[in-house]
Design a protein with these regions (language model features):
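Acidic-enriched, low-complexity/disordered segments with a strong bias for Aspartate over Glutamate
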Residues: 9, 18, 40, 56, ...
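Core dinuclear metal-dependent hydrolase active-site scaffold
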Residues: 1-52, 66, 115-122
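Metallo-beta-lactamase
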Residues: 28-84, 89-95
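Binuclear metal-ion centers of metallo-dependent hydrolases, dominated by the metallo-beta-lactamase
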Residues: 1-2, 49, 73-122
Length: 122
């Protein structure tokens, strides 16, 4: 973890994720913004290490199955990180492996559900 790749003005940093050996989260720095993508991960207090990156936005898995945090665990992590924008992900992928994203976005400051095939600007 902590490996960094720079591509032009974009910096990508691999961060801890509790899933498989190969799994990692991702910090993306671009245009003076810092984004955190949890990737597949179970709840683990090591996720709070993300605080040092001071992300402006989090993209956190919420489906609670197959090695991923559930909504309440995702809320705990996102609230501790304290980003201005918090976006649930990893839901509605499979009928038997989903969660209502509103359970996340309605219970955190800056909660936001992205629409499919839409572009967003931070």
């Amino acid at each position: 973890m902590g490996e960094t790749l720079k591509i032009g003005d974009i910096t990508l940093t691999a961060v801890f994720a509790d899933h498989t050996v190969e799994a990692f989260g991702l910090i993306v720095n671009a245009e003076n913004k810092t984004l955190y993508f949890s990737g597949d991960t179970l709840f683990n207090e090591r996720l709070f290490e993300i605080l040092e990156y001071k992300p402006d936005a989090t993209f956190i898995c919420i489906n609670g199955r197959l090695g991923n945090m559930n909504v309440n665990e995702a809320l705990t992590v996102a609230k501790k990180i304290g980003a201005k924008t918090n976006i649930p992900n990893h839901y509605d992928m499979f009928a038997s492996n989903s969660e209502d994203p509103r359970l996340f976005s309605d219970n955190i400051d800056g909660g936001f559900i992205m629409e499919f095939n839409e572009e967003y600007e931070f």
